[in-house]
Swiss-Prot record:
The keyword Ion transport does not apply. It catalyses: (9Z)-octadecenoyl-CoA + 2 Fe(II)-[cytochrome b5] + O2 + 2 H(+) = (9Z,12Z)-octadecadienoyl-CoA + 2 Fe(III)-[cytochrome b5] + 2 H2O; (9Z)-hexadecenoyl-CoA + 2 Fe(II)-[cytochrome b5] + O2 + 2 H(+) = (9Z,12Z)-hexadecadienoyl-CoA + 2 Fe(III)-[cytochrome b5] + 2 H2O; a (9Z)-octadecenoyl-containing glycerolipid + 2 Fe(II)-[cytochrome b5] + O2 + 2 H(+) = a (9Z,12Z)-octadecadienoyl-containing glycerolipid + 2 Fe(III)-[cytochrome b5] + 2 H2O; (9Z)-octadecenoyl-CoA + AH2 + O2 = (9Z,12Z)-octadecadienoyl-CoA + A + 2 H2O. This is Delta(12)-fatty-acid desaturase. The histidine box domains may contain the active site and/or be involved in metal ion binding. The C-terminal sequence (-YNNKL) is necessary and sufficient for maintaining localization in the endoplasmic reticulum. One of its GO terms (molecular function) is acyl-lipid omega-6 desaturase (cytochrome b5) activity. Changing residue 295 to V: In m7FAD2/L7M; Converted from a desaturase to a bifunctional desaturase/hydroxylase. In m4FAD2/L4M; Converted from a desaturase to a bifunctional desaturase/hydroxylase. Changing residue 63 to V: In m7FAD2/L7M; Converted from a desaturase to a bifunctional desaturase/hydroxylase. ER (microsomal) omega-6 fatty acid desaturase introduces the second double bond in the biosynthesis of 18:3 fatty acids, important constituents of plant membranes. Delta(12)-desaturase with regioselectivity determined by the double bond (delta(9) position) and carboxyl group of the substrate. Can use both 16:1 and 18:1 fatty acids as substrates. It is thought to use cytochrome b5 as an electron donor and to act on fatty acids esterified to phosphatidylcholine (PC) and, possibly, other phospholipids. Very low constitutive hydroxylation activity. It is a multi-pass membrane protein. Keywords: Endoplasmic reticulum, Fatty acid biosynthesis, Fatty acid metabolism, Lipid biosynthesis, Lipid metabolism, Membrane, Microsome, Oxidoreductase, Transmembrane, Transmembrane helix.
Length: 383
């Protein structure tokens, strides 16, 4: 099949909004990764240092402008207006810093440039600034990409089976309980995952992203975990010096609250990319890499798609070709959608509606009852 070729798929690739929760195919697809790659224009795989830096520098300039306005003009506002200005700053700065987080994440995928040392340098600097242990998460995230959709080996947001639901689960299965759980997840989910592997796959031993001897890592990776920790400590020391000079309240308002927004968006984005009523999970008897990579969903965050460098609405392509730079992912997605057909899942439900729906509908997974594939698991919510 030549570039731009098409392979038959079970049904049309276009879905109505009422079809978004219909189960995607779980059979082995009639196409290969090679077929998908041939359909993508070759230039989409090329990484440009000037272009990559242009997005990073643009985000830095915007974040710096927000910081400058907040530090120089908010104190001049009458009190009622300052109560409006600070939440606006937190929301806007948190969104822009999430964009910087995404670019540092691309560095971990070697999608920023053709030079691994440059990618790692940029990624270490900017992930450390956002209190992310760069190399530590780079390696665990790489394993997530290698095992997406596997109930045994995926790294994060591994769904539970019904037997693993705690006794109090049924008491939280109501609107108030869901809102409470979502709030805890968005506020504490990211630091708890990094520190204690909460929502991650089980390991023998202390699975902590800051611990070089954690079972997450092999011997070749441990030295770089120390580098990640050094980056975090350096930023923490800088924050301490800033707080000592300018006050803790200033540090919290200018940096701490926007960082909470970043962490919340990170958890939300990841949660909605991998949690959806239509998506299967697989045990070892059924899982393979391609079907696992396709067990993801693209979402629509409106204008935030651009602010987040399209990590939200091109996630399927990202899982298939993770070294592709974000600025080519939209074109690549359009190229592969006709081949993917029903294997491609897009849900345009507003994120604030989708997060509640998924919290309600996707409580645990159970084996497929409608077919003969006992190694395929689907979400359910009947406790």
């Amino acid at each position: 099949m030549g570039a731009g070729g098409r392979m038959p798929v079970p049904t049309s690739s276009k879905k109505s909004e009422t079809d978004t929760t219909k189960r995607v195919p779980c059979e082995k697809p009639p196409f290969s990764v090679g077929d998908l790659k041939k359909a993508i224009p070759p230039h989409c795989f090329k990484r440009s240092i000037p272009r990559s830096f242009s997005y990073l520098i643009s985000d830095i300039i915007i974040a710096s402008c927000f910081y400058y306005v907040a530090t120089n003009y908010f104190s001049l506002l009458p009190q009622p207006l300052s109560y409006l200005a600070w939440p606006l700053y937190w929301a806007c700065q948190g969104c822009v810093l999430t964009g910087i987080w995404v670019i540092a994440h691309e560095c971990g995928h070697h999608a920023f440039s053709d030079y691994q040392w440059l990618d790692d340098t940029v990624g270490l600097i900017f992930h450390s600034f956002l209190l992310v242990p760069y190399f530590s998460w780079k390696y665990s995230h790489r394993r997530h990409h290698s095992n997406t959709g596997s109930l045994e080996r995926d790294e994060v947001f591994v769904p539970k089976q019904k037997s693993a639901i705690k006794w109090y689960g049924k008491y939280l299965n109501n609107p108030l309980g869901r809102i409470m759980m979502l709030t805890v997840q968005f506020v504490l989910g990211w630091p708890l995952y990094l520190a204690f592997n909460v929502s991650g796959r089980p390991y023998d031993g202390f699975a902590c992203h800051f611990f070089p001897n954690a079972p997450i890592y092999n011997d070749r990776e441990r030295l770089q975990i120390y580098l990640s920790d050094a980056g975090i400590l350096a930023v923490c020391f800088g924050l301490y010096r800033y707080a000592a000079a300018q006050g803790m309240a200033s540090m919290i308002c200018l940096y701490g609250v926007p960082l909470l927004i970043v962490n919340a968006f990170l958890v939300l984005i990841t949660y909605l990319q991998h949690t959806h009523p239509s998506l299967p999970h697989y045990d070892s008897s059924e899982w393979d890499w391609l079907r696992g990579a396709l067990a993801t969903v693209d979402r629509d965050y409106g204008i935030l798609n651009k602010v987040f460098h399209n990590i939200t609405d091109t996630h399927v392509a990202h899982h298939l070709f993770s070294t592709m730079p974000h600025y080519n992912a939209m074109e690549a997605t359009k190229a592969i959608k006709p081949i993917l057909g029903d294997y491609y899942q897009f849900d345009g439900t507003p994120w604030y509606v989708a997060m509640y729906r998924e919290a309600k509908e996707c409580i645990y997974v159970e084996p497929d009852r409608e077919g003969d594939k006992k190694g395929v698991y689907w979400y359910n919510n009947k406790l």
